[in-house]
């Protein structure tokens, strides 16, 4: 669970997270449906995406032995298995520590596209050291990619 500052109605927002685990989504949804109503706070399911992901470009995520600057992360993607996005993530100072770096990437993805979309729209993630930015996009633009993909899927149906 996490809290945010007061919203436009002067209520605190309490986010109930599934920890990125799809199997916990029904539990989160049920908790939200049973949550009390209040004039002081309200509950929302899943960690929300930042309203303006480009504002994240000035931030870094420090954890473990290193820090990861969001402005140094780029991506390319394809539609992979099960119609999920397969992301190739390119990091300026990638040190090869996939486990620690993936933890940070998932945390950042939760901020860029939200916990729900991270868990339901992203399939595999492959990490690379950034050699060139040619053909790549800043990770903060992934939300636009998802919106475009959802629009393309809707139109094609």
Residue ranges and their predicted role:
Residues 9-10, 50, 63, 116, ...:
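Histidine (H) residue identity feature
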Residues 29-31, 56-59, 100-103:
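Surface-exposed beta-strand edges and their flanking turn/coil or helix-capping segments
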Residues 34-37, 62-65, 107-109:
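Short, low-complexity, polar/charged sequence segments that are solvent-exposed and flexible
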Residues 40-95:
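Aromatic/basic-lined ligand-recognition segments
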Residues 2-53:
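Aromatic- and glycine-enriched beta-alpha-beta binding-site module
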Residues 8, 58-61, 142-143:
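Long, disordered, Ser/Thr/Pro-rich
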Residues 78-156:
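Long, hydrophobic alpha/beta structural blocks
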